[in-house]
Amino acid sequence: MNYHRRLHPGRCGNGKGGLVNIDCSGNRVAGMIFGPKRVIVVAGANKLVDDLDEAVKRLRRIAPLNARRIKHHTPCVETGKCMDCQVQQRLCNYLTVINHGMKFPGRITVVMVGEETGF
């Protein structure tokens, strides 16, 4: 979970919030986008950023740490920064942005924890 402060149905594009994710296989983001009737996202304050550009920068800065944690063999593990690699174990295959949930109001609930959680 990343950019902006809140996810408000019907307020897309006015700086009220959204969810930005990068995923390796798409299995985590797929369930957020379509599937269950309710989605609850719990995230720490360290995941909040000011805008979409900052969200993507943050994800690319964090991805090498996560790749190292799960023992993927990618260039970013070696260099410590995103190399926009084209290898099979790449973590950054799917970038999703959920701007709002107008189609299904109340389906996504974001619970913010007032401390740092994970990467």
Predicted regions and their residues:
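Conserved phosphate- and dinucleotide-binding cores of soluble alpha/beta proteins
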Residues: 2-119
